[in-house]
UniProtKB/Swiss-Prot annotation:
Segments of skewed composition (Acidic residues): 369-383
Origin species: Aspergillus clavatus (strain ATCC 1007 / CBS 513.65 / DSM 816 / NCTC 3887 / NRRL 1 / QM 1276 / 107)
Ranges of compositional bias, category Basic residues: 394-403
Signal found in the keyword field: no
Protein name from the UniProt record: WD repeat-containing protein jip5
Length: 414
């Protein structure tokens, strides 16, 4: 179904990944606190001198992955990344207790926010960051807090306080999925979102706070994504939230009926329990695959489930030892998977059959990053546009088990 266009080695473990909403740009946050932003080669065909169309540079290996900038953004790990809704800003949050807002194009920091401390006075490390609109930034933390920041209010240096704080779950928030705005919305931006935390799902409203929390599901819920345009029947409006569990089960929740799940799909069955469904991403309709979701597994694979049929129809392997913690699709429809010390970019396989299991290992066309010009200081100076040489992929021993809080499944940005 998908073939690897390129494999991009990283200098440290990937903790967070964000995909630009409007350009072929990917940012990664690493265990070392570094943030790096790459521009992917264009998929668009170009005309040769003789007037005939050539294959895209991304497909024939002649393109380059450019490092737009790289810096050590946080002291400690960079746990969360997220682009603003227009892609102009990139928000990062780290175990140093800071949120930093930087220009996506240059990496220059424009604002800093100090995350409120935990009750015992320690750093309340972040788990998710999400720009809901140009005005609202959501930040979830280890203590189960969900902070809302109004981006229109001028910030003093490292002193901004959240406008609201909610606690939709007893445990830390593992995923956050915005719901589409209503038909009567004047802003066009979401004002409600679904979160998972511990064994429950909750819905929170921008103005009214936490509206509903589900029954205990009996297993940890770790990822979520919204999918619309499904067939309507009876009370179903064709809108669902899909939730990935820690035991390999994907549950489907009807929008508006949040008390309990209404369908279950067994994605990864294993003796003694399935593998965690770490991250979810809806396959773009433009690819013509029907209603389908890509699922990044703790075992390193990516499985594709067709909604309606409710069955796994294809699979690719990101890494044989490291789990997938970042997954999404760029503006040109390419899948981007991240986990361990590698990011892979995939395009639709020519002549692929959706019903075949594709275990493509991928071919290395482009290489990764370098630490040569970085120091260990928390510098905000960004390294501009560097071409990446080809480097061999290095296999590493698996050193992170599922369920650790430092491994955050970053959902695709709307």
């Amino acid at each position: 179904m998908f073939d690897t266009v390129c494999t991009l080695p990283l200098s440290a473990d990937l903790f967070s990944q964000a995909i630009h909403p409007n350009e072929p740009v990917v940012s990664v946050g690493l265990s070392t606190g570094h943030v790096q932003t790459f521009r992917l080669p264009s998929e668009e065909s170009s005309d040769d001198d003789d007037g005939t169309a050539s294959n895209s540079s991304a497909r024939n290996g002649k393109g380059h992955i450019d490092t737009m900038w790289r810096t050590r953004r946080h002291k400690g790990s960079c746990r969360c990344l997220g682009f603003g809704v227009d892609g102009e800003m990139l928000y990062s949050a780290g175990t140093d207790g800071l949120v930093k807002a930087a220009k996506a194009e240059t990496g220059v920091v424009e604002n800093k926010i100090a995350i409120p401390l935990a009750k015992d006075g320690s750093v309340d490390a972040p788990t998710i960051i999400h720009a809901l609109s140009p005005q609202t930034l959501l930040l979830a933390t280890d203590s189960s807090a969900l902070h809302l920041y109004d981006l229109r209010i001028p910030f003093s240096n490292v002193s901004a306080k959240p406008q609201q704080t909610h606690h939709p779950h007893d445990d830390y928030i593992s995923s956050l999925t915005p719901l589409p705005p209503s038909d009567t919305s004047t802003s066009g931006f979401s004002k409600q979102w679904v979160t998972t935390g511990g064994t429950t799902l909750a819905v929170t409203d921008l103005r009214r706070g936490v509206m509903v929390r589900s029954e205990d599901q009996g297993e940890e819920l770790v990822s979520s994504v919204y999918i619309g345009g499904l067939a309507s029947s009876g009370t179903s409006r064709g809108e669902k939230v899909l939730v990935g569990g820690s035991s390999g089960v994907l549950t489907l929740w009807e929008k508006g009926a949040w008390d309990d799940q209404d369908e279950r799909i067994y994605v990864q069955r294993e003796a003694g329990g399935g593998e965690a469904l770490e991250t979810l991403a809806v396959v773009p309709d433009e690819l013509g695959k029907g209603k389908m979701v890509a699922i990044g597994l703790g075992s390193g694979g990516v499985k594709f489930v067709r909604i309606g049929m409710n069955k796994v129809v294809s699979e690719v392997m990101h890494d044989e030892t490291e789990g997938v913690i970042g997954l999404g699709f760029d503006v040109e429809g390419r899948m981007v998977s991240g986990g361990g010390q590698v990011v892979k970019v995939w395009h639709e396989a020519v002549g692929s059959n959706d019903m075949d299991v594709d275990m493509a290992g991928g071919k290395r066309m482009f290489g990764g990053d370098s630490d040569d010009s970085d120091d260990d200081n928390d510098s905000e100076d960004s390294e501009q546009e560097q071409r990446q040489p080809v480097e061999p992929q290095r296999k590493r021993k698996k050193n992170k088990g599922k369920g650790k809080r430092d491994i955050i499944a970053f959902a695709d940005i709307d």
